[in-house]
Regions:
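Acidic/histidine-enriched, beta-strand-rich ligand/metal-binding domains
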Residues: 1-71
């Protein structure tokens, strides 16, 4: 997991073999939200976005199968 500069998102991680994006939000720091089927291009756009929270809400949240786990 990599810390990011965002008021919404605490950290993100990505497994290119399974195309799974993992996101930890500041509001739920003990929960990892896992998004399946996220392409490398989408992750690159996400990590390079000026507003990661806005990108997350418009391009990721609610658009991919999601599971969550407690850390």
């Amino acid at each position: 997991m990599q810390q990011v500069k965002s008021s919404l998102i605490k950290s993100i991680g990505y497994n290119p073999l399974t195309e799974q994006l993992s996101v930890v939000l500041h509001t739920s720091p003990s929960t990892v939200f896992n998004y399946d089927g996220v392409s490398r291009a989408t992750v690159n756009n996400f990590t390079n976005a000026t507003s990661k929270g806005q990108f997350f809400n418009s391009k990721i949240r609610g658009r991919f199968p999601t599971s969550k786990s407690v850390i």
